[in-house]
Amino acid sequence: MVRMAKTTCSPRADRQQALHAARGRILAAGMAALLTLPALPASAANFTPPDGCRLEVTVQNRGCTVSQHYRCSGDAPGDQWVVYFTPDGPRYQSRIDRETRWMESTDLPSGLVDTLEPGAKDDASFSTLLKTGADDFDFWTSSSNGERLHHVGRDELTGEKVDIDGVELELTRFQLTTYNESGDVLIEREGQQFISRAQGRFYGGVERSSDWTGAVENTNDSPVSFSFPGQPGFGSTKPEYDCDLQMVRGGKPDLMRQLMSFKEART
């Protein structure tokens, strides 16, 4: 929650002032995030990563999204970025490190930015998952709107391997619970994802989520096709799968958008 300094204005004026200030910060954050992305033509034909960065692969996913995965020379070794596009344009951007920790993520339409707080009780560890077959995590993130979120969960390798469009992936099971700062459950998620050892990242899968309102949602964000440099579809920003089903979420309150954005945080 955004806290405003007390003034001599009426309570109504205080609320209006707080609302305008919060909107200003969100818009400013959104513009700053969007300015880090290269300008796209009206047709949104291709994605070009920022200067000093190299696009590695474009992935078409279920659920009407296409993701652009890239690395930047100025980042720490092992860091990588992803930008997700819907038919309406870029929606979500995130950076993970070599252990797939959620370093920072931005919900581009709202401008909300979440960053990993230091000193986690149990950081996510991709190397632990690969070595032992399971990894527990327990960490906090801070949002640009003042919200602090507590994430607790577990990833497990199922032992199954699949080939999707020529890329070898391994299946995982996961469960994740996100709490607010007071310890109230905001959202619970469980399901199946994929990992790529070679690429050092997660990909979405089939999952079930339930939030504090009691709403339940079942989604499928599995990868369908991979386009590498020189291949058709590399850099395309037009989603190709499930768009006729209108599965893309939109118009949700900021908190729900923020919570659901963690679906893509490590992918």
Residue ranges: model-predicted function:
Residues 42-82, 125-131, 135-142, 258-267:
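N-terminal cleavable signal peptides for secretion/export
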Residues 63-64, 85-96, 102, 114, ...:
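Short, surface-exposed beta-strand/loop "edge" segments at domain boundaries and coil↔beta transitions
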Residues 67, 91-93, 149-156, 171, ...:
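Short, surface-exposed coil-to-beta transition loops
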Residues 74-133:
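An acidic-aromatic
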Residues 126-182:
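Extended beta-strand-rich segments in extracellular/periplasmic secretory proteins, especially
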Residues 28-38:
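Bacterial N-terminal signal peptides
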Residues 167-254, 261:
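Extended soluble regions of mature proteins
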